[in-house]
Structure formats: C-alpha cells, structure tokens
From Swiss-Prot:
Keywords assigned by UniProt, alphabetized: Allosteric enzyme, Glycosyltransferase, GTP-binding, Magnesium, Nucleotide-binding, Transferase
Record pathway: Pyrimidine metabolism; UMP biosynthesis via salvage pathway; UMP from uracil: step 1/1
Organism in which the protein naturally occurs: Heliobacterium modesticaldum (strain ATCC 51547 / Ice1)
Protein name (database record): Uracil phosphoribosyltransferase
BP-aspect Gene Ontology terms: UMP salvage; uracil salvage
Protein family according to the UniProt entry: Belongs to the UPRTase family.
Record-linked CDD domains: PRTases_typeI
Length: 209
C-alpha cells in the first residue's frame, strides 16, 4: 500500500495559510505556490541515492557525496500544475518536464484527456506528478495511468491540498504510488471542491476562469 505523507514543516504550513486566503492576489499566489513546491521538492527527494566522491577545495581534498545519477522527471497536470513546475526544476534542474492535459467533465466529474507530452524515457526515470489539488482523484488517477502506459514504474504524486476522497481513489487505483500533501482537508462539497481548500487553483494562479 502506498504511503500518504502530510508535510507539516513550519514554512510549508505558514505559506499555505496565505495560499488559502481569498485576499491573496494572483501574483502573490503564484509566488507562494512556487515556494511551497520547492519546499515539498526538498522533502520528496530526501531518499535519492548518493555515491561518495572527492573534490579538491582550496585547502585540501574533501570526501563528499553526490547524487547517484538517478534520472528524474516532473509531470504537471494542466493547467494548475504549471504553478508548481518552477519550484521543482529550480531545485532539480536536470529533471525532464512533461505535461498532461485533463479537464473534468462537469456532469460526470471524470477526467477527459486533451494533451499528453512526456519524456521519451519515462521507464528509466523516477517520475513526480504535481497538481495543487487532489479532490476526487479522477485527474490524478488518469495521469498516473497514462504514465504507466508509457512505461513509468516509479511514480510519486505531490499536491498542496488533498481530500480524503481523492486519496482513497488514488490508493485504490494506484496502490504503488506514494502521495505527498501539504494538507489533508476534511471533505469535498457538492461541486467537488475541497473544503475548506483554496478555491480553484488554476483560476487563482492565472487570474482567468
């Protein structure tokens, strides 16, 4: 069974408070989402393997450690996932970036794919799927399925806010995928919005509905 990790780091929780606030404008919202994404990237990559090496300092030779050549990929679920991309690639500049476009059918609430562009070597990479919200879990589950169809074997899902319904859906459909969230909120409302959540992340990031 997959792990569900709630990141309670003080900086993440502090910034998340301002992200939630309805009084936070698009510019500040974008900046905060990027900052929290970077903090989450730090935690998500905590278990990357290291190898020992040596470097020459101005004084002497030092024994150090570097990443063991593990290939990483980051996939944003459009459009709101775009707000988290920079936070990840600033910390992991060598990561390849993919995009999956999904929209939620207003009647069925199920995802419909309209775009998919992934690194060609996803089977060789540890993939990180990012999206600010895990509500019903439909979009996340569909994106994870797409990655697996392309050969991805090691995947993590990173979201700002999750609802129990979304967590259950991903656990049911993809029990091998660990979920990382900054917060787990109580429930969804009748419109499948996370309560209390933060509203529509895409609208708030880009100032358009």
């Amino acid at each position: 069974m997959a792990r569900v990790v709630i990141m309670d780091h003080p900086l993440i929780q502090h910034k998340l408070s301002f992200i939630r606030s309805k009084n936070t404008g698009s510019k500040e919202f974008r900046e905060l989402v990027e900052e929290v994404a970077m903090l989450m990237a730090y935690e998500v990559t905590r278990e990357l393997p290291l190898v020992e090496t040596e470097v020459e300092t101005p004084v002497a030779v030092a024994k150090t450690k570097v990443l063991a050549g593990k290939k990483l990929g980051v996939v944003a679920i459009l459009r709101a996932g775009l707000g988290m991309i920079n936070g990840f690639v600033k910390l992991i500049p060598a990561a390849k970036v993919g995009h999956v476009g999904l929209y939620r059918d207003p009647k069925t609430l199920e995802p419909v794919e309209y775009y998919c562009k992934l690194p060609p070597d996803v089977a060789e990479r540890d993939m990180i799927v990012i999206d600010p919200m895990l509500a019903t879990g439909g979009s996340a589950s569909a994106a994870l399925t797409l990655l697996k169809q392309k050969g991805a074997r090691h995947i993590k899902l990173v979201v700002l806010i999750a609802a129990p319904e979304g967590v259950s859906r991903v656990e049911q459909d993809h029990p091998d995928v660990d979920i990382y969230a900054a917060a787990l909120d109580p429930c969804l409302n009748d419109h499948a919005y996370i309560v209390p959540g933060l509203g529509d992340a895409g609208d708030r990031l880009f100032g358009t509905k």
